[in-house]
Amino acid sequence: MFWESAEHATERISPILDSVTIAIGNRDECQIAVGTRDPDEAADRLLARGLEMAVVKLGGDGVMVATADGRRERIPPFPVEVVCGLGSGDAFGGAFCHGLLSGWDPVECVRYGNAAGAIVASRLMCADDMPTVAEVEAFLAERAGDPGEHATSAATAATSQENHQ
């Protein structure tokens, strides 16, 4: 951690949340940012701060996305044989932002991010092996019908590598 303590990190991060539109974090990062590892509570606390979208990465249980307009979805991960999880979170974030900048629905952004993260996790290298758009699209096409294809509602969902996504 870059901070002296978890408490110091929370002190420094909390005021910044008032200027944030979208937050992405795993359970540990949510604990630091808003004081809870519970994904639904973390999303509620982030949205209560005025964010438009909260994305909580749930490791092997996928990703939960919640929006200020009341939408809440859990998107399952794509199962892959993990070779090295390093960089999968960066791939998720980059692919998620690609989707946002392309005007996609939040669930599609998460699904695309999950695919990119899964691709990187299935490879030995991380920075040198970031997937291209064509690779992510091919991955998604090969897995049409896989659990990661369709989001499930938070009410029916069971709860990628948490610390690496």
Region spans (language model):
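Conserved phosphate-binding/catalytic region of the ribokinase-like
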Residues: R37-Q165
